[in-house]
UniProtKB/Swiss-Prot annotation:
The gene is pqqC. Belongs to the PqqC family. GO terms for molecular function: pyrroloquinoline-quinone synthase activity. HAMAP family: PQQ_syn_PqqC (MF_00654). PANTHER family: 4-AMINOBENZOATE SYNTHASE, PQQC-LIKE PROTEIN. This is Pyrroloquinoline-quinone synthase. It holds the Pfam family TENA_THI-4. Keywords: Oxidoreductase, PQQ biosynthesis. InterPro entries: Haem_Oase-like_multi-hlx, PqqC, PqqC-like, Thiaminase-2/PQQC. It catalyses: 6-(2-amino-2-carboxyethyl)-7,8-dioxo-1,2,3,4,7,8-hexahydroquinoline-2,4-dicarboxylate + 3 O2 = pyrroloquinoline quinone + 2 H2O2 + 2 H2O + H(+). Ring cyclization and eight-electron oxidation of 3a-(2-amino-2-carboxyethyl)-4,5-dioxo-4,5,6,7,8,9-hexahydroquinoline-7,9-dicarboxylic-acid to PQQ. CDD domains: TenA_PqqC. SUPFAM superfamilies: Heme oxygenase-like.
Amino acid sequence: MNDAAPMSPAEFEQALRAKGAFYHIHHPYHVAMYEGRATREQIQGWVANRFYYQVNIPMKDAAILANCPDREVRREWVQRLLDHDGAPGEDGGIEAWLRLGQAVGLDPDQLRSQELVLPGVRFAVDAYVNFARRASWQEAASSSLTELFAPQIHQSRLDSWPQHYPWIDPAGYEYFRTRLGQARRDVEHGLAITLAHYTTREGQARMLEILQFKLDILWSMLDAMSMAYELNRPPYHSVTSERVWHKGIAL
């Protein structure tokens, strides 16, 4: 039991923001993309693997809604599902990501098939969705606070990719532009929930560990991509050049 006095809301927020030092914007794979050193294959591999993350975000948010008894929270949180899945008659973030895939030369059907998703990426994303299903709704909601750092990473792509990768169709950048505003809005709500819920030192320490868990997920995804697309050591590379890994097991 931790009997230390809790951090004030301002101190707690500062501790949360300090975790940005471990955000995946600092991963060598992302740095290479930002600095224009990534190959076409590396860009395509990143887009294809991140698509698995994109299609699972609504599943994560649906789990939070299912576990949340607070109607007012649900009313606001449901916007996240609409952002990704799209409102009736409107496209959402998933369609925008498919257009990004087309912009970098990938076929939308291939993206949807998830055949390019590396096992390490799949395991990381699945761990996040399963956490959201099993944790309290407050803990699952607060795990989204890597969004504190998201506007910077979206802006970095908008600032650097058009210059370094003229072969990418600019229409594909719609997702990043849209998420700039959405992420800032989502941060306000997620941060309010987090600061209100974690009022003991023990709870605050747990939340910082939850945020680190989410940072680990994002970093591990890029580690898997580095092995496959930078070091040319995808799964089973020593025994076959074929993509023999599983494509997802429906349960």
